[in-house]
Amino acid sequence: MDADPHVSELFDPTAWRAVDGFGDLTDITYHRAQGQGAVRIAFDRPEVRNAFRPHTVDELYRALDHARMTPDVGCVLLTGNGPSPRDGGWAFCSGGDQRVRGRDGYRYADGVDPAGAGRLHVLEVQRLIRFMPKVVIAVVPGWAAGGGHSLHVVCDLTLASREHARFKQTDADVASFDGGFGSAYLARQVGQKRAREIFFLGRAYDADEAHAMGAVNASVPHADLERVSLQWAAEINAKSPTARRMLKFAFNAADDGFVGQQLFAGEATRLAYMTDEAAEGRDAFLEKRAPDWSRFPHYF
């Protein structure tokens, strides 16, 4: 069976099925893995190196949020379709489409409600990736530049094409800057000096160089990239869902302030609700009696 030309050369149609209810997508594709709880969300504008416009971000957020709320999905693969029909180049995402950038952000097409114009809501996507209780893997087949570079940074893991992946922070070249996860969290990954080099010099790094500095988990032969990403997803999904969720929030907590504390503590509260002790507290309240805590030890 030939790969769907509207997906990607690396896409194996026997391994995936389209997610129901998303047939109207134009700028991304959204598929569910056959036989495991993983989804593939891909930028689908290869002719412009998978640059995003506001409509792209709307679709991306919608698919990611659907994956977040799907109870049997544990892993999200975020990638870019390709290659470009124009020149054969590959891209994960090259950031915001500068052709639609205005003074107040990135502009919707003509005819869209002006109240929605001038957006920088890819930052909302960053927060969704950061805070969703699922493991998000950036699968980078080509260029990850500018805002696309920041998206790979905020993902939990990154796999990259050894032959074609290129990492380049172009923000300062176009008078932009990611003052949040794209820079500060990058410094956590590669160190302050290296992160400043990446932003201030704007050089391109291949997969092996990015792996050596700690920004990439594995440099993978291009032809094997999606197969390996599915294997990683399968290994992740073989672990405890509760442990994975708590681990992600624990890793994030030190950098995320009170928001990180709330997310971790909220999950801990939900775990506490599952205990007999919590059931006793609830039942005593509903039965208008004093709770009997005598069965529950004071652990140390």
Model-derived regions, located:
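Glycine- (often His-adjacent) and acidic-residue-rich active-site loop
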Residues: 48, 80-125, 175
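Well-ordered beta-strand positions
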Residues: 157, 197, 201-203, 209, ...
